[in-house]
Amino acid sequence: MKIAVIILNWNGAKLLHQFLPSIIQYSENATVYVADNASTDDSIAVLKRDFPTVKIIQNKSNYGFAQGYNEALQFIDEPYYALINSDIEVTENWLNPII
């Protein structure tokens, strides 16, 4: 079953370093996306340099929470998805109840 994990980000380079590793590690059967809400920090550079397996969706503006996710979902092909905040640390098998 294909599932997308989508993290909304705005100026969260520090949070990406802190929490994205667990999401990547424990989402082995998912495609991980970061939807960036027009960050002005180095979030995009951090993603490209340190997390090359993560797919980046660059929103044109800071759309806020709901619209930011809605904009990102236009680029997702997977039939199922999990929307999570950038300050969430996941644990092993966290996706099992969803799939």
What are these regions (language model features)?
Residues 42, 88-99:
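Acidic donor-binding/catalytic loop of UDP-sugar-dependent glycosyltransferases
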Residues 59-76:
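Glycine-rich, basic loop-to-helix element that forms the pyrophosphate-binding segment
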